[in-house]
Amino acid sequence: MEHLLNPKAREIEISGIRKFSNLVAQHEDVISLTIGQPDFFTPHHVKAAAKKAIDENVTSYTPNAGYLELRQAVQLYMKKKADFNYDAESEIIITTGASQAIDAAFRTILSPGDEVIMPGPIYPGYEPIINLCGAKPVIVDTTSHGFKLTARLIEDALTPNTKCVVLPYPSNPTGVTLSEEELKSIAALLKGRNVFVLSDEIYSELTYDRPHYSIATYLRDQTIVINGLSKSHSMTGWRIGFLFAPKDIAKHILKVHQYNVSCASSISQKAALEAVTNGFDDALIMREQYKKRLDYVYDRLVSMGLDVVKPSGAFYIFPSIKSFGMTSFDFSMALLEDAGVALVPGSSFSTYGEGYVRLSFACSMDTLREGLDRLELFVLKKREAMQTINNGV
């Protein structure tokens, strides 16, 4: 019966991240630096609110867009955090995680033949949805521009078929962010064009040395903002996302959302209400720890002689391994088998990720030290072997 399936569904592949994770699971004594979620527990006060909701039997369907009380709290929370304002009743939707928000947004705005401009390297979760919509992903090489999708790069990629530009910043896998001036330049370029911006800001509370800016501040009428609590409050399993869009767009996204999931979990929504009401600074402790880890990891990688752009957000770093003359998959497999360290091959993040590996520092300092010690020894041995070959020995 498989041949009767939608060809586009059959053509979708399991993400490179998941494929490599399955290989890692077959090995023992592995230091895994692949994880894409916080290594902190959900704050106690958030868990307590969920327990209270369970005890009070808050287990029914909610409004499709989510509890109004939660949407109102999210409106105030994001107005303080990101300096943009969407109406709680008509422009905010509570979704089953940020991924479902992205899915609902794309299914609403894309038609067959449309083009979606995205930076490469990029998280692999966008492309399959775009393909399922019959649209075309247009991945732009940003490796020579500090991994940033600039206004100039967007302008060069624009065609009459362009329907959307994806701005996933802070970035997974590179950790880079866009400055206020860079966002203003993009907004000036796109303003008045028949082009949406999907701004995925799920890592917005994990920025270092500079504040996070949202393009919605400068291009509100064309922007769909995706956010949530997975990274800011360590709530990946609670599946709570936020979608913000102008009301004439949001009302149609809401229909797609309704027929997909009806509503986000009632218990998770009550936990989210507590998070955005009384957990305004919950991300601070995590951010401080991530910053210490980032500085340590960056310094270690530089000391190894690896070419790397220092991230300004998220909890990933994306060093180049091109000097070793290996594909990112072969390098990662050799590192796994010879040193017991797992990094994600850069090829998992589009063809423009080839020649890089993703390292997550969402783990303890002890784990990072051991993993980087092993990586350093592996790098030294690889270079010695290359030198021996070059010397004709």
Swiss-Prot record:
GO biological process, one term: amino acid metabolic process
CDD domains: AAT_like
Catalytic activity line of the entry: N-acetyl-(2S,6S)-2,6-diaminopimelate + 2-oxoglutarate = L-2-acetamido-6-oxoheptanedioate + L-glutamate
GO cellular component: cytoplasm
Residues where N6-(pyridoxal phosphate)lysine is found: 231
Membrane-spanning intervals of the chain: none
PROSITE patterns: AA_TRANSFER_CLASS_1
EC number: 2.6.1.-
Cellular localisation: Cytoplasm
InterPro entries hit by this protein: Aminotransferase_I/II_large, AspAT/PAT-like, NHTrfase_class1_PyrdxlP-BS, PyrdxlP-dep_Trfase, PyrdxlP-dep_Trfase_major, PyrdxlP-dep_Trfase_small
Main location: cytoplasm
Key words of the record: Amino-acid biosynthesis, Aminotransferase, Cytoplasm, Diaminopimelate biosynthesis, Lysine biosynthesis, Pyridoxal phosphate, Transferase
EC supergroup of this enzyme: transferase
Function noted in UniProt: Essential for murein biosynthesis. Probably catalyzes the conversion of L-2-acetamido-6-oxopimelate to N-acetyl-LL-2,6-diaminopimelate.
Quaternary structure (record): Homodimer.
Family from the record: Belongs to the class-I pyridoxal-phosphate-dependent aminotransferase family.
Listed name of the protein: Probable N-acetyl-LL-diaminopimelate aminotransferase
Organism name: Bacillus subtilis (strain 168)
Gene behind this protein: dapX
